[in-house]
């Protein structure tokens, strides 16, 4: 019989060993949630493009109306130990680049939204004051080489958002998405 402690260790191991799959699943959930919410708000001019690989620092290009966002997504367990993430400096060159750090439960439910970015049309906040990231594996001499294009962002560099509506507001400057939904729900029970 499995104890609670064993179950937690097993879940954490599953998350660690399948992190790429986990990130793909959460990316699909996040995109679906954003598109569904925009649909509920009557906003239908939406496009989502996926990068084949992360050379330019973004995972998604999200367009809504005339706002285009290059988004790098990060995912971690809400009660996990992850205190920082690496950001590709190329993201600063992308139009309206931003990073969204999603906190998920063991069942991949998104419960936390963190934001690092600026208003649409503006560049990322300056990354020069942040430490340079290092490779996870050391070379033959035991040295972990620097990753010149990567900077470390601690959790404190991110703004914790109230939820999906505030995230959509940051991405696309759609004000008071939450209030619009309440009005819609009241008119259309």
List the predicted regions and their residue ranges.
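Mixed-charge (Asp/Glu-Lys/Arg
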Residues: 1-56, 61-189
């Amino acid at each position: 019989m499995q104890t609670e402690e064993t179950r937690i260790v097993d879940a954490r191991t599953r998350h660690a060993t399948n992190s790429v799959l986990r990130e793909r699943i959460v990316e699909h959930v996040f995109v679906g949630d954003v598109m569904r919410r925009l649909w509920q708000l009557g906003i239908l001019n939406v496009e989502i493009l996926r990068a084949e690989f992360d050379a330019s620092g973004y995972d998604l290009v999200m367009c809504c109306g005339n706002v285009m966002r290059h988004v790098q997504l990060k995912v971690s367990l809400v009660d996990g130990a992850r205190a920082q993430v690496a950001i590709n400096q190329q993201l600063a060159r992308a139009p309206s680049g931003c990073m969204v750090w999603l906190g998920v439960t063991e069942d991949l439910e998104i419960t936390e939204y963190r934001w690092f970015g600026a208003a649409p049309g503006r560049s990322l906040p300056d990354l020069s004051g942040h430490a340079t990231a290092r490779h996870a594996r050391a070379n033959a001499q035991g040295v972990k080489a620097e990753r010149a294009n990567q900077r470390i962002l601690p959790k404190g560099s991110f703004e914790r958002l109230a939820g999906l509506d505030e995230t959509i507001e940051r991405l696309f400057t759609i004000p008071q998405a939450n209030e619009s939904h309440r009005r819609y729900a009241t008119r259309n029970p």
